[in-house]
UniProtKB/Swiss-Prot annotation:
Keyword field: Cell membrane, Membrane, Transmembrane, Transmembrane helix, Transport
Function text: Probably a pantothenic acid-binding protein that interacts with the energy-coupling factor (ECF) ABC-transporter complex. Unlike classic ABC transporters this ECF transporter provides the energy necessary to transport a number of different substrates. The substrates themselves are bound by transmembrane, not extracytoplasmic soluble proteins.
Cellular compartments annotated: Cell membrane
Pfam families, sorted: ECF_trnsprt
Gene3D superfamilies assigned: 1.10.1760.20
Subunit field text: In E.coli forms a stable energy-coupling factor (ECF) transporter complex composed of 2 membrane-embedded substrate-binding protein (S component), 2 ATP-binding proteins (A and A' components) and 2 transmembrane proteins (T component), probably with a stoichiometry of 2:1:1:2. May be able to interact with more than 1 S component at a time.
Protein name: Pantothenic acid transporter PanT
Keyword field contains ATP-binding: no
GO cellular component term of the entry, any: plasma membrane
């Protein structure tokens, strides 16, 4: 039991380290990436962690993802930083919005919870693919809905639709990446974990 808990903590720490490295790498790539689609990869450790370690640890990984999003949006100013940090002014205003905290944390925490339960329905590669799809879609749907609900009137609907289109385009790429990598990684990690 103690060995299993220690192993889970070690795996959790590895996932967090991967998330930090991926975020740093992504920030570099975004600056030189010539295409408008800039998908995130931070959902992958959260989804895979949820499947492998359970929904509680998945929720914790989602919280870490939210914290990374919040800190990055607070430090690195981009046109969409206000969506994830109340310390960045909303476009067209001189103040931030507390809803940035909601968008930064709640969708990400739920991405850490839902894949575990989806995977339990079909405990195989198909289940891993469905869990990856569900986790990625959860983030996309909640972020888009939040943009429209919390910022639609402030941004005027045309700008919120533009932001929505950007997020939706990114999410298609994110879903494809998540499904491919999760279906490849989860069986290998599950086997390695069961053998240890």
């Amino acid at each position: 039991m103690k060995k299993s808990k220690a192993s889970d903590v070690a795996i959790l720490a590895i996932f967090i380290a991967i998330m930090v490295v991926v975020q740093l790498f992504t920030q570099f790539v975004i600056n030189v990436w010539p295409f408008p689609v800039k998908p995130t990869l931070l959902h992958l450790p959260v989804i895979i962690g949820s499947i492998i370690l359970g929904w509680r640890k998945g929720a914790f990984l989602g919280l870490v993802w939210g914290l990374i999003s919040f800190v990055t949006a607070t430090i690195v100013t981009t046109p969409t930083s206000f969506l994830f940090s109340p310390f960045q002014p909303v476009i067209g205003t001189h103040h931030g919005s507390p809803w940035g905290l909601f968008i930064a944390f709640i969708p990400r925490i739920l991405v850490g919870i839902l894949p575990y339960f989806v995977y339990k329905i079909a405990n195989n590669r198909l289940g891993a693919g469905l869990a990856a799809f569900a986790g990625t879609a959860t983030n996309t749907v909640l972020v888009l809905t939040s943009i429209f609900l919390f910022f639609g009137s402030t941004l005027k609907w045309s700008l919120s639709y533009l932001l929505g289109a950007i997020v939706a385009t990114n999410s298609l790429t994110e879903v494809i990446i998540a499904v491919i990598l999760t279906t490849a990684i989860v069986p290998a990690l599950t086997k390695a974990r069961n053998n240890s």
